[in-house]
UniProtKB/Swiss-Prot annotation:
Homodimer. This is 5'(3')-deoxyribonucleotidase, cytosolic type. GO terms for biological process: allantoin metabolic process; amide catabolic process; dCMP catabolic process; deoxyribonucleotide catabolic process; dGMP catabolic process; dTMP catabolic process; dUMP catabolic process; IMP catabolic process. Dephosphorylates the 5' and 2'(3')-phosphates of deoxyribonucleotides, with a preference for dUMP and dTMP, intermediate activity towards dGMP, and low activity towards dCMP and dAMP. It comes from Mus musculus (Mouse).
Length: 200
């Protein structure tokens, strides 16, 4: 009987491991207390600057200034259960785990802070498992756990199955029957990995 290869799991960072949305809202309200804001339960669409810009055009630039500022990514709180889940996943037999994250185009602070966040919260061994890319479709894997609902790039049919991680901006979306969702890190992520393993 042939030995099965390991399951490779790609895990997004912002909105999946690090609480980008809460950090953004808190930072925006702190910096611009007089401006209108979008409560988390009313967030719609992956890009916050687009929703803020629809409220008033100048708000798009203001909200972007929050996540482009030094310290923003470094100081994000972990998503509940994320760190323990990733450590357990990494210890699973025949399972390879990588953190697959897209840096901002305005990357001055973002890139270094993402590395430091991983080292501070998960340890140096996970720094070795960071993949920074603007196009996740070209990264080889079996599963991609990501809060972005529509991931496009050079590859029309990526090697991975996209598991949508529930976040405030996507919780209202109805997925087709062929798509799977992970509601939180308390949800059955182990079952998703094992079902993928069985299909390899």
């Amino acid at each position: 009987m042939a030995v099965k290869r390991p399951v490779r799991v790609l895990v997004d960072m912002d909105g999946v491991l690090a609480d980008f949305e809460s950090g953004l809202l808190q930072g925006f309200r702190r910096r611009f207390p007089e401006e209108p804001h979008v409560p988390l339960e009313q967030r719609r669409g992956f890009l916050a600057n687009e929703q803020y810009g629809a409220l008033r055009p100048d708000l798009a630039e203001k909200v972007a200034s929050v996540y482009e500022s030094p310290g923003f990514f470094l100081n994000l709180e972990p998503i509940p259960g994320a760190l323990d889940a990733l450590r357990e996943m990494n210890d699973m037999k025949d399972t390879e785990v990588f953190i697959c994250t897209t840096p901002l185009l305005k990357y001055d602070h973002c890139v270094g802070e993402k590395y430091r966040w991983v080292e501070q919260n998960l340890g140096p061994e996970f720094v070795e498992r960071i993949i920074l890319t603007r196009d996740k479709t070209v990264v080889m894997g079996d599963l991609l756990i990501d809060d972005k609902d529509n991931i496009q790039g050079l590859e029309e049919t990526p090697s991975w199955e996209h598991i949508l991680f529930t976040c405030c901006h996507n919780q209202h979306l109805a997925l087709p029957p062929t798509r799977r969702r992970l509601l939180s890190w308390s949800d059955n992520w182990r079952g998703i990995i094992e079902s993928k393993r069985a299909s390899l």
